[in-house]
UniProtKB/Swiss-Prot annotation:
Pfam families (alphabetical): Ribosomal_L11, Ribosomal_L11_N
InterPro entries assigned to the protein according to its UniProt record, in alphabetical order: Ribosomal_uL11, Ribosomal_uL11_bac-typ, Ribosomal_uL11_C, Ribosomal_uL11_C_sf, Ribosomal_uL11_CS, Ribosomal_uL11_N, Ribosomal_uL11_N_sf
PTM comment text: One or more lysine residues are methylated.
Name of this protein: Large ribosomal subunit protein uL11
Function: Forms part of the ribosomal stalk which helps the ribosome interact with GTP-bound translation factors.
Keyword RNA-binding in annotation: yes
Xref: CDD domains: Ribosomal_L11
Length: 141
C-alpha cells in the first residue's frame, strides 16, 4: 500500500545553515517528523549554495517519513545579487536602485525555469523582468 501524504510544508532557509530552532522546529514538529534528520539532509543538499536563501518543499507522509525537495533561490534574491544591491527600492518607479543586463536576466531565467510556471525561456524572462521592475532594478541592453 502506498504511503498517504499528510502535508506539504514549504520553507525558505539559509543554505547549509538550517537549525532545529524556529521556523524549522515548530513547522515540522507538529507533524511528528525527526527534525534533526531533516536539518542534516537539508544542510548536506544545500551546502554548495552557501550564502543564499534556498526554498525547500517537504512532503510529509502518514508513517512520519518525509521527502525534501530543494527549489531554486527566490528571483528577488538572484536579482539583488546580480544588481549588487542590498534591497529593492521603496519607490521603484521614481528611484531605481540598480541595473542588470539582458544576459544576466536570461541567466537568472534559465536558473529559475524548472520551478517556474513558464513554458519557454522568453516567458520566464518576462516574469523575472517584472520582478526586477517591481524591485526598482532597470534592465539595460
Amino acid at each position: 500500500m502506498a504511503k498517504k501524504l499528510v502535508a506539504v510544508v514549504k520553507l525558505q532557509l539559509p543554505a547549509g545553515k538550517a537549525t532545529p530552532a524556529p521556523p524549522v522546529g515548530p513547522a515540522l514538529g507538529q507533524y511528528g517528523i525527526n527534525i534533526m534528520a531533516f536539518v542534516k539532509e537539508y544542510n548536506e543538499k544545500s551546502a554548495s549554495q552557501a550564502g543564499s536563501i534556498v526554498p525547500v518543499e517537504i512532503s510529509i507522509y502518514s508513517d512520519r517519513s518525509f521527502v525534501a525537495r530543494l527549489l531554486t533561490p527566490p528571483a528577488a534574491d538572484l536579482l539583488r545579487k546580480a544588481a549588487g544591491v542590498q534591497k529593492g527600492s521603496s519607490n521603484p518607479k521614481r528611484n531605481p536602485v540598480g541595473t542588470i543586463t539582458r544576459a544576466q536576466l536570461r541567466q537568472i531565467a534559465q536558473q529559475k525555469l524548472p520551478d517556474m510556471n513558464a513554458n519557454d525561456i522568453e516567458a520566464a524572462e518576462r516574469i523575472i523582468a517584472g520582478t526586477a521592475r517591481s524591485m526598482g532594478i532597470k534592465i539595460v541592453d
